Amino acid sequence: MTIKDSIYASEQQVKDFSFDQNVVEVFPDMIQRSVPGYATIVSTMGKLAGEYAQSNSNLYDLGCSLGAVTLSMRRNIRTDNCHIIAVDNSQAMVERCKVHLQGFKSEVPVTVTLGDINELEIQNASVVAMNFTLQFIPHAQRQAVLEKIYANLKPGGVLLLSEKIKAENELCDNLLIDLHHDFKRHNGYSELEISQKRTAIENVMRPDTLSTHFTRLKDIGFSQTQAWYQCFNFCSMIAIK
């Protein structure tokens, strides 16, 4: 049974957002009501992983939370000898992810690991997924993380990246923010919840523009980049080595 997200329903001294036990308990409801098209994004990331998975390789889900993308990838893999490695830096998320994955049987092995992406060793990868993860990594560390991913991707391998983005100018950025807030209102969030969540997350999640993402990926060496989904200020893209 999905528990409704009411973390910010009452007035409070708002702390910086973190993926703690309180968030874990309501995360499925929170993400569905907060990210437009989340189910489509997760499903498509799985299909793309199945398309680009190479035999005898690893697939990574970096910032795996409760394992939605991991499960989607596992359902779509038809290639021999693939191993999925799911990583998150939240102990609460990792523990719940392991329990969640046990409820679904598959011949594709999955290892769920507690770890810092900045320190993670990536090896023999054909697919790396980051579903709304890079945005929580400090700006100064993003280039190094992406360079490490690129260096350890096999030729023809892909990075599947979903991010909250900001527009190129303030007028358009405010438009996208307003549309997103309307989406959250439609899904039952109050003005207080929207305001307090924004306060909680603004210091820990710092989005880039789409052009910043594409320029950085190209400069690192990816041969092709393409956005395949966008709704308001949420975008999913693929980068091919």
Curated annotation (Swiss-Prot):
A family per Pfam: Methyltransf_25
Known EC number: 2.1.3.-
UniProt xrefs under InterPro entries: CmoA, Methyltransf_25, SAM-dependent_MTases_sf
GO molecular function: carboxyl- or carbamoyltransferase activity; S-adenosyl-L-methionine binding
Gene3D superfamilies found in the cross-reference section: Vaccinia Virus protein VP39
Signal peptide coordinates: none
Keywords: S-adenosyl-L-methionine, Transferase
Gene Ontology terms: biological process: tRNA wobble uridine modification
Catalysed conversion reaction: prephenate + S-adenosyl-L-methionine = carboxy-S-adenosyl-L-methionine + 3-phenylpyruvate + H2O
Source species, domain of life: Bacteria
Keyword Transferase (UniProt): yes
Transmembrane stretches, start-end: none
Positions bound to S-adenosyl-L-methionine: 38, 63-65, 88-89, 116-117, 131, 198
Role noted for this protein: Catalyzes the conversion of S-adenosyl-L-methionine (SAM) to carboxy-S-adenosyl-L-methionine (Cx-SAM).
Similarity comment: Belongs to the class I-like SAM-binding methyltransferase superfamily. Cx-SAM synthase family.
Record-linked HAMAP family: Cx_SAM_synthase (MF_01589)
Quaternary state and interactors: Homodimer.
The protein's name in its UniProt record: Carboxy-S-adenosyl-L-methionine synthase
Gene: cmoA
